[in-house]
């Protein structure tokens, strides 16, 4: 029995006009985006189509990606496609919570708009940096971060694949970690174009505000298992608030999450929402995995044909 997991895109996957074709062609997609606009108090479709500056600002990026992803999820559900498990990268975890039945969509929209604003305030653009480290053993990376942390905060932030780990933190400390990694033989280090050092201790203030906002939301039972970023384990309802609070300031354990899904029998991964970042990671983790992504009319039709 083939088991299928839906994976939901995270921040950085956004692009101008994402989801436009599907919005024009399918009522459920239009209804979902319009529903988000009502919650937000601004025209989300117009922002996604016409305002690239805002679309790349964390407080707008997060609801834009969430709404686009959930709209596509609802369309697939309408077509009879349902996952056996779900997960999402960072922000994508909120789309996964909606898909799993644990979080109401309108609550999710309001929540990620707050999350985006808190993250922006806690780590204003330019306040830190993130660097992807390729083809370097995890223990070497962790050791370099530990040594460099005499200069400030620097830790692994995203364990994307065994050969791609992102470190993040304060500029001086990250730069020192990069020097140490180069001395240790790391050849490929790529500075990332992100608005802040997410998933590090620099987001403590955002984490505290988010904790407060999360207590005001009512969560439901999971209709489908969700593998969480922070521990790479199936999330339990009574721990949702704790794990989402920690998720902003702790590393995302993506490749361990994929391994857990594979242990549970998942062989097919469908990436939902803008971009193909997660499909790329899964391919690096296991080149035998079956992959598809759905973000526009062409990819939807290709997926439905298979």
What kind of region is each of these model predictions?
Residues 249-266:
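A short, acidic, amphipathic alpha-helical segment used as a generic capping/interface helix at domain edges
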Residues 12-13, 100-242, 246-248:
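Alpha/beta catalytic cores of group-transfer enzymes, especially the acyltransferase/condensing modules
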Residues 77, 182, 262-265:
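Non-catalytic positions within long, well-ordered alpha-helices that form the structural scaffold/packing
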Residues 191-194, 262, 295:
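Short glycine-rich catalytic loops that host catalytic nucleophiles or stabilize transition states
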Residues 2-140, 188, 268-297:
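FabD-like malonyl-/acyl-CoA
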Residues 61-63, 197-198, 251:
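Glycine-rich phosphate/pyrophosphate-binding beta-alpha loops
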Residues 300-305:
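Short, charged, surface-exposed secondary-structure boundary motifs
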